[in-house]
């Protein structure tokens, strides 16, 4: 979790794929640590950058696709979920970190069924 925490600004905000909002590294880690140690302990993520838009020399916005491949530790067993992430990145001490992140699960708007994008 130390490497995960290092990605974020101290006062970062995070909205997970279920709409749960937290603020600050401690709350972000508190939200993620239990699932990383249990249901996602044998899962992997594949990320694909869509775009980066510079707002200033020290602030940019990025969008990227993320595919979670859950393993046997997940109660539903092995399966995949695609999400679209939006981040606001800030440069701090010549290094980029996440100031804000929002994660949205791809679903069918009529049924709520989780859908996978075509790769």
Show where each model-derived region lies.
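A mature extracytoplasmic/lumenal domain signature
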Residues: 65-66, 102
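Short hydrophobic/aromatic-rich beta-strand segments that constitute the beta-sheet cores
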Residues: 14, 62, 98-100
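Short, cysteine-centered beta-strand-loop-beta hairpins and adjacent loop/turn segments enriched
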Residues: 68-79
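Short, surface-exposed coil-to-beta transition loops
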Residues: 45-47, 63, 79-85
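Extended, polar beta-sheet/loop recognition surfaces of beta-rich domains
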Residues: 118-119
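A solvent-exposed, acidic/Ser-Thr-rich amphipathic alpha-helical stretch
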Residues: 1-58, 65
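Short beta-strand edge/turn micro-motifs at domain boundaries
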Residues: 82-113
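A short, structured loop/turn motif at beta-sheet edges
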Residues: 52-61, 89-97
């Amino acid at each position: 979790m130390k490497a995960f925490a290092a990605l974020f600004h101290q006062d970062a905000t995070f909205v997970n794929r279920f709409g749960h909002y937290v603020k600050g590294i401690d709350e972000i880690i508190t939200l993620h640590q239990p699932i990383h140690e249990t249901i996602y302990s044998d899962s992997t993520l594949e990320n694909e950058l869509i775009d980066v838009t510079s707002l200033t020399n020290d602030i940019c916005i990025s969008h990227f696709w993320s595919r979670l491949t859950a393993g046997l530790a997940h109660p539903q067993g092995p399966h995949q979920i695609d999400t679209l992430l939006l981040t606001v990145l800030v440069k701090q001490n010549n290094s980029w970190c996440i100031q804000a992140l929002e994660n949205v699960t791809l679903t069918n708007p009529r049924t709520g069924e989780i859908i996978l994008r075509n790769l």
